[in-house]
Amino acid sequence: KSGVGRITIPDSLAPGYAALYGPRNFYSFYLVPGQQQEITRLTGQEIKFAGAAKAINIYLNSPFLNNRDPGYEKGEEEFLKAWALMPGRLQSHLDSLPLPADFKKSERKRLYYVACHSLLDYPLRHARLLRLKSYSPGERYYRKVSELLQEDPSAHEFWEYRQFFRNGIQLLGERKKTETGKPLDKLKCELDYICNHIKDEELAGYLVDESMSGYIRYFGSEGMEAFLPLYREKVKDEKQKAAFFRSYEQYTRLEKGRKAPHFSLLDKDGNRKNLSDWLG
């Protein structure tokens, strides 16, 4: 009733980044296990921090960091020139702040991938700002995305790093889908890229699971059989594997042509309806 919640973090964890999700937004948060920290939501979107890492948390939720726009309304060539300045600007802003040196060291690496996400946002944001029904960037844009997909195992702890690879590879796969109109071709393009370019086993397993689990959620299990051996090879986490194959088995029961499970109920007029009476 008071709206106050308490979360206890094990002292054995190292300080690091977290995200606090609300009904309409989320806040970045730097956790320091073993120390007291507070976050208070005021009116509207305004929030207040107290306790350990207060200055860091104010920085992470600052307008400068979260309202970055390299010029999404610009044409491709102009946008790429403007975007090239973003990593340096983010770094300079960080260097100008009186924040702990150990935090700055890790934050510099994370900021690079924050900027990379802004690059991936360009096609969708450009289309929305110019009210275009569809928009596909040119070869130069896709070449830039490919150039930036360089592995750095020391950055795997950062969500922004993992998501940049996931979203970047999906963007390249979406281009293939645009050519053929088939979602399965997009998935194959993503998996081919992972197999041919990703050397880090931990990152490869993460990306294969993201691509195949995402495909099943949106398009079902049809056509997935050929990729199952690859999943077993690349994904090492047994709990992750179990969750994936549980989902896969559930979706195979929804394939076209399969008999519907037994289920019946009374409608508002008292007539019994069976699920097997319906098609679709």
Where are these regions (language model features)?
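A non-transmembrane, solvent-exposed segment enriched in polar/low-complexity residues
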Residues: K1-S106, R110, V114-Y122, H126-S134
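Serine-centered coil/turn micro-motif
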Residues: A52-K54, E139, F158, E238
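Solenoid-like repeat scaffolds
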Residues: S96-L99, I194-K199, R232-D237
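Long, charge-rich alpha-helical interaction segments
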Residues: E151-Y218, G223-A226, A243
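N-proximal helix/coil linker or "cap" segments that precede and/or mark the start of modular domains
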Residues: G205-V208, M212-L279
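Extended amphipathic alpha-helical segments with heptad-repeat/coiled-coil character used for oligomerization
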Residues: R108-G168
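Alpha-helical repeat scaffolds
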Residues: A127-S146, P183-I194, E222-R232, P261-H262
